[in-house]
Regions:
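Membrane-embedded alpha-helical bundles that constitute the cytochrome b-like, heme-associated redox core
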Residues: 1-150
Length: 150
């Protein structure tokens, strides 16, 4: 179960890094001509750094069989999830508004620069990242309580 959690964590991290890349490419740090991001940089940075640090702790746990490190990795996942849910709830209104503007329901199409960088996040990627993260947490919990032989 521990190795399955590791694989799930790696895949989740790669999908998350794709989202960070999209955000960095689309983000106008000068705030000239584009709406400011609704995702605070410290929250994004904290989420990414905690996720990568937690992944490292989980790898060390698997190699050393240290229960303390396993539970620490799970605690880190809780913090990672809290930051992820914070970003998700701040992204939803941007996505809804951008989809409505793209459809032209209000008689005119709104330019991309009227929306923050996270408008470019593909919905399937965001949903997939969240589902993978939930799977990772579940697998880590199962591994830590001894289901699946380690």
């Amino acid at each position: 179960m521990g190795v399955a959690a590791l694989i799930s964590w790696f895949v989740t991290a790669f999908v998350g890094l794709y989202l960070v890349a999209v955000w960095l490419i689309e983000n106008d740090v000068t705030h000239r001509g584009a709406a400011a991001s609704r995702l605070p940089a410290p929250v994004i940075l904290g989420h990414v750094l905690l996720a990568l640090s937690g992944l490292a702790v989980w790898v060390i746990h698997l190699l050393s069989h240290s229960s303390m490190l396993g539970w620490s990795a799970l605690g880190m996942l809780v913090a990672i999830g809290a930051l992820g849910l914070t970003m998700f709830t701040r992204w939803i209104p941007v996505h809804i508004a951008y989809v409505a503007a793209e459809s032209g329901k209000h008689g005119r199409r709104v330019a991309d620069y009227d929306f923050p960088a996270e408008r470019a996040f593909p919905l399937p990627v965001v949903v997939g990242h969240g589902l993978l993260a939930s799977t990772t947490v579940t697998l880590v919990v199962l591994a830590m309580i001894g289901v699946g032989g380690g």
